[in-house]
């Protein structure tokens, strides 16, 4: 197996405040969310995934989405998520009246059974919604990001064929979308499959910003992220302490413990590989400790416990 090549720089999107805490059992205060977001932004992360614009009756954690955005410095690049046209309209209103929103994620599961379970829509019906959302966001100069979930499979359907994923990419590209995420929603990917899918996608659509988003159910999240980087991806998602993962609302059977790639551990690995992220690791570790304090428990960062490798230790 050939080792992936390392680029000179990578942009890391910090997902703690959105994908990280969406399923957290306690609703956090706006102030606590902003404390962690502010610390993460101060470390130099390239983008913050800050909130979901979904009904509070569905996800109470994001009832304060506008208030959270209002508390984030304008210099910080912001991503949010929504799932329908009504939410897209709300995103546009926040963009115009609260603060700039740079990207808005729109989930679209490559597995149709997963899309039905997660969003209650078959592919054909979801395409109608997504097309309207893309138009609504684009008219407001917000970059629509199609998040192709279950890109490597899901427990309901099993394997998802690459042609299905590429069919969604081609459809989105035809709608003018130039930001596309491949998500390993239930931790079924492996580095070889990641390399194959992203290599083909980057070659076929070279003007698309492809984004890698891995859940770490089976402990290969960082390996998969590095494989994506080696295949040409230059934007990757991670979450402080590895918080987050697959929403519990999806009925998909027992898939074990979920979680995102740990931002601190990923950035430490990239730093050791001399890949620039623009992130100050010490400041990021501080943000991770603050996230632990806010959530009231130890999280999953190994670098927080063992410390980063010092160059003098390498022989």
PLM feature segments, named:
Residues 1-315:
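Catalytic cores and adjacent flexible loops of soluble metabolic enzymes
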């Amino acid at each position: 197996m050939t080792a992936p090549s390392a680029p000179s720089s990578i942009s890391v999107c910090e997902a703690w405040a959105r994908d990280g805490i969406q399923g957290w059992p306690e609703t956090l205060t706006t102030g606590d969310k902003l404390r962690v977001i502010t610390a993460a932004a101060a470390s130099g992360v390239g983008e913050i995934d800050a909130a979901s614009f979904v009904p509070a009756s569905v996800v109470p954690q994001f009832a304060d989405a506008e208030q959270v955005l209002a508390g984030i410095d304008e210099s910080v690049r912001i991503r949010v998520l929504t799932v329908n046209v009504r939410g897209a309209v709300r995103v546009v209103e926040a963009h115009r009246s609260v603060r700039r929103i740079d990207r808005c994620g729109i989930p679209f599961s490559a597995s149709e059974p997963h899309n039905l379970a997660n969003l209650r829509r078959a592919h054909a019906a979801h395409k109608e919604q997504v097309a309207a959302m893309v138009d609504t966001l684009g008219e407001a100069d917000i970059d629509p990001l199609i998040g192709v979930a279950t890109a490597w499979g899901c427990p309901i359907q099993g394997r998802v064929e690459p042609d299905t994923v590429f069919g969604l990419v081609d459809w989105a590209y035809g709608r003018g979308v130039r930001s596309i995420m491949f998500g390993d929603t239930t931790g079924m990917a492996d580095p070889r499959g990641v390399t194959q899918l992203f290599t083909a996608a980057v070659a076929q659509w070279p003007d698309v910003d492809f984004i890698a988003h891995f859940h770490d159910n089976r402990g290969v999240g960082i390996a998969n992220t590095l494989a994506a980087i080696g295949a040409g991806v230059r934007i990757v998602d991670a979450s402080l302490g590895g918080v987050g993962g697959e929403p519990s609302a999806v009925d998909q059977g027992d898939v074990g413990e979920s979680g995102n790639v740990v931002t601190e551990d990923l950035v430490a690995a990239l730093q050791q590989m001399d890949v620039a992220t623009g992130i100050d690791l010490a400041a990021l570790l501080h943000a991770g400790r603050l996230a632990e304090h806010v959530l009231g428990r130890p999280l999953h960062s190994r670098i927080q416990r063992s410390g980063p490798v010092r160059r003098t230790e390498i022989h």
